[in-house]
Design a protein with these regions (language model features):
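GAF sensory domains
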Residues: 21-156, 183-193
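Conserved phosphoacceptor histidine of two-component systems
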Residues: 168, 172-176
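Long cytosolic heptad-repeat coiled-coil signaling/dimerization helices
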Residues: 129-132, 165-169, 198
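Signal-transmission linkers at sensory-effector interfaces
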Residues: 1-25, 144-150, 160-161, 166
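Short, intrinsically disordered, charge-balanced linker/junction segments flanking boundaries
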Residues: 1, 195-198
Length: 198
């Protein structure tokens, strides 16, 4: 009784600490690959499972998924999780190596992808606290992916502004270079028009 409760409290404390740590690491991630690697490492360390991050593009289409080293991803369940925005479980959560849990990465505006989790063959189904941990991780990943999206949007906007300034400068320089000779030619034409023929 008491030892079990003490052990459960210790596990909860370790997982809370791990969540704070992964949140900090995800906040510093600069690429999708870094986010994916952090997710895999966290799921492996905390639950002994394998994870695959399947991001969605800007049109909310899932990008082609690689396979999990431990097993396969069910594309139908992946699509169901993306379409419904809800966690989808295969009938049997106990490990057989194939992905059996699909968590949507819901951000403030839309779903940013799916986290597919595969439990190793022969492992029991995760307890409720393990599922809650995965849902918290999915929320953190969604926030990180949304932040990366907005960084890309800001960089793209900045690039457009710089290219527009460059285009404007080039056109201004060209127009000045063309204006000077044209002004001289117009002046000469006016002079010739004003001169009476002999």
């Amino acid at each position: 009784g008491l030892k079990r409760k003490a052990h459960e409290a210790e596990v909860r404390e370790q997982r809370t600490k791990a969540l704070y740590e992964i949140a900090r690491e995800l906040a510093g991630a600069l690429t999708l690959e870094q986010v994916s690697e952090l997710a895999r490492r966290f799921v492996g360390e905390q639950l002994g499972a394998d994870a695959l991050l399947v991001p969605a593009d800007e049109y909310a289409h899932l990008q082609p998924a690689a396979s999990l080293p431990a097993g396969n991803v069910d594309l139908l369940l992946l699509r169901m999780a993306a379409d419904s925005g809800q966690t989808v479980r295969r009938d049997e959560l106990s490990g057989d190596g194939d992905a059996s849990l699909y968590l949507p990465l819901r951000a403030s505006l839309r779903t940013r992808g799916i986290l597919a989790v595969a439990f190793p063959a022969g492992t029991p189904a995760p307890a409720d606290d393990g599922l809650a941990l995965l849902e918290a991780l999915a929320s953190l990943i969604a926030i990180a992916l949304e932040r990366l999206h907005y960084v890309d949007v800001a960089q793209s906007s900045e690039l457009k502004i710089v290219s527009e300034r460059l285009r404007s400068s080039i056109l201004s320089a060209l127009s000045h270079d063309l204006r000077t000779p044209l002004t001289a030619l117009v002046g000469l034409a006016d002079s010739l028009f004003l001169v009476k023929p002999p």
